[in-house]
Amino acid sequence: MAKEWGYASHNGPDHWHELYPIAKGDNQSPIELHTKDIKHDPSLQPWSASYDPGSAKTILNNGKTCRVVFDDTYDRSMLRGGPLSGPYRLRQFHLHWGSSDDHGSEHTVDGVKYAAELHLVHWNPKYNTFGEALKQPDGIAVVGIFLKIGREKGEFQILLDALDKIKTKGKEAPFTHFDPSCLFPACRDYWTYHGSFTTPPCEECIVWLLLKEPMTVSSDQMAKLRSLFSSAENEPPVPLVGNWRPPQPVKGRVVRASFK
């Protein structure tokens, strides 16, 4: 029971509820999106992000993903609009990916799995701290972007070039002057629903904005992401791959689309 969660058979998503009961809750993420069942909601606004590149601080390998951390001590890098009631502060972004190009995303669209999924995590500063926001149904807003295989994305390469400094679990390196909006697709259409973090403790505090249009990266770029290790420097090497949670039951939740 007292084991660290992970993605292996003995500590993977099927076991998370043993340590974190909410992982079997009614508002868990990710989910399967069935576009024929999703209604367009004309009241949904466009969303916008104004990110300060100077707020990017570090990149780290925590053994579960690679994460870029931002300064969120004041309103520097903000997400607004869409289904949100007010502005949200960017705290970090991270990725989920598979062991090969044909899977790796957490959400699926009409059965399609993408090669990876990028999550930009923001919190609602009306709750004063990130920790307080985690306890509120509208505490967190995550922009999810699918990665599909195609031509190389130059802006993504900036991130990948930093991975050599964080090959193994526990490594952290400076990562500054980066505006993640350079990764956004041209089309801002999105789906939205109420869900949870896709990693333990799986708190159900998230307003999801899932972008319809994926970001295109090359197969070589995905291979670079898979060159990370989930093991520490002094341990036998274990590749960091397959860090995705499968879709969870929708349980009557409504998914809305910002587009027809």
Curated annotation (Swiss-Prot):
State one molecular function term (GO). zinc ion binding
The record's listing under CDD domains reads: alpha_CA_I_II_III_XIII (cd03119)
Transmembrane residue ranges: none
State the Gene Ontology BP annotations.
Answer: response to bacterium; response to ethanol; response to oxidative stress
* Cross-referenced SMART domains: Carb_anhydrase
Spell out which residues are annotated as carrying Phosphotyrosine. Y127
Tissue-specificity statement = Expressed at lower levels in adipose tissue from animals that were either genetically obese or had experimentally induced obesity.
Class of this enzyme: lyase
Modification S-glutathionyl cysteine occurs at: C182, C187
SS bond partners: none
- According to its record, what are the GO cellular component terms? cytosol
Phosphoserine modification sites are S29, S43, S48, S50, S55, S219
The EC number(s) given in the record are 4.2.1.1
Cited InterPro entries: CA_dom (IPR001148), CA_dom_sf (IPR036398), Carbonic_anhydrase_a-class (IPR023561), Carbonic_anhydrase_a-class_CS (IPR018338)
In which compartments does the protein localize? Cytoplasm
Q: Which residues carry this modification: N-acetylalanine?
A: A2
* Record keywords, A-Z: Acetylation, Cytoplasm, Glutathionylation, Lyase, Metal-binding, Phosphoprotein, Zinc
Annotated segments matching region Involved in proton transfer: 64-67
Entry binding sites for substrate = T198, T199
Its activity is regulated as follows:
Inhibited by acetazolamide.
Q: Which family does it belong to?
A: Belongs to the alpha-carbonic anhydrase family.
Name the UniProt record assigns to this protein: Carbonic anhydrase 3
